[in-house]
């Protein structure tokens, strides 16, 4: 959906036609285990995603392939989905660990966007996390406070990854 205005239903006919071609082309490919037509449908130029568009594409996907799960939109904002996909770039290992310990222990998922995409017990899939950078002389990109050196980077990466593996 790169470059697509997913807040405007006028984009749906072309997008859906291309998406259905992809599904037909790749349906029998052995490496396809799940479909995901959208990624990070954040508010676009001050306009919210059109939930009906996301729902329509999800339902068309399920109509064509009812066997595989479908993630309606990876990252945000879920409307109708088989798997609750999460992007979490929290850099504080303890905060990150507490979030997913809570999910494992109580079934509650921390989501700062819960008002827009309520979690209703779907399987959770962490498709993006980390994003840690090492402080560099130039303007390196990453989330949160950069690691001061490789050792700090590796310690943080290990902590974030262990928090997921433990849950």
Residue positions per predicted region:
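Substrate-binding/catalytic cleft of secreted carbohydrate-active enzymes
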Residues: 1-167
């Amino acid at each position: 959906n790169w470059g697509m205005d997913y807040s405007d239903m006028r984009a749906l006919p072309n997008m859906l036609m291309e998406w259905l071609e992809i599904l037909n082309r790749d349906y029998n490919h052995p490496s396809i285990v799940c479909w995901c037509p959208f990624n990070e449908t954040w508010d676009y130029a001050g306009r919210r995603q059109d939930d009906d568009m996301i729902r329509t594409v999800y339902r068309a996907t399920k109509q064509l392939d009812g066997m595989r799960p479908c993630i309606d939109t990876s990252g945000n904002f879920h409307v109708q989905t088989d798997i609750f996909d999460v992007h979490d770039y929290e850099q504080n290992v303890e905060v990150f660990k507490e979030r997913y310990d809570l999910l494992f222990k109580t079934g509650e998922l921390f989501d700062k966007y819960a008002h827009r995409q309520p979690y209703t017990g779907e399987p959770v899939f962490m498709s993006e996390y980390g994003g840690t950078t090492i402080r560099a002389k130039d303007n390196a990109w990453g989330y949160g406070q950069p690691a001061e050196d490789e050792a700090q980077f590796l310690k943080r990466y290990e902590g974030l990854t262990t928090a997921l593996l433990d849950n």
